């Protein structure tokens, strides 16, 4: 039995939401989109992420969400994404979110280089999730 039924009045077509983002990415010639806002994660995954989390959306194919390792299994269970597309990071060398996501993104890019879209802005709501200056600098240096 399918997990979702398109005839259900509460059905939300999450794969189509991803395709819509990918269509917009193509218009802007983006190879990867790095989402960090709480609303973006919920809107694309159908899961709640109480910890710092990110979603990497490639130009084609399924996105991958990254969250704190202790919450990854629960987030994967809540999401329409399978467990191979909801990964955990940990505050240890090589397993922190910047290192893990950077390596993941580089594998998606031809020759490890490409155009990456990020979420940027400001909000009065603290957990909004825009990239912090620290995260932006670390990602920029790691992906340069």
PLM segments and residue spans:
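A composition/biophysics-driven feature that prefers long, compositionally simple stretches
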Residues: 1-144
């Amino acid at each position: 039995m399918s997990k979702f039924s398109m005839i259900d009045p509460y059905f939300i077509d999450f794969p189509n939401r991803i395709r819509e983002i990918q269509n917009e990415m193509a218009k802007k010639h983006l190879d990867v989109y790095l989402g960090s806002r709480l609303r973006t994660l919920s809107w694309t995954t159908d899961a709640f992420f109480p910890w710092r989390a990110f979603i990497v959306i490639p130009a084609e194919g399924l996105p991958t969400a990254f969250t704190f390792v202790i919450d990854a299994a629960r987030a994967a269970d809540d999401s329409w994404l399978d467990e191979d597309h909801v990964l955990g990071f940990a505050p240890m060398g090589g397993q922190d979110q910047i290192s893990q996501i950077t390596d993941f993104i580089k594998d998606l890019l031809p020759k490890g280089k490409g155009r990456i879209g990020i979420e940027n802005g400001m909000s009065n709501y603290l957990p909004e999730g825009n990239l912090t200056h620290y995260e932006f600098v670390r990602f920029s240096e790691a992906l340069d």
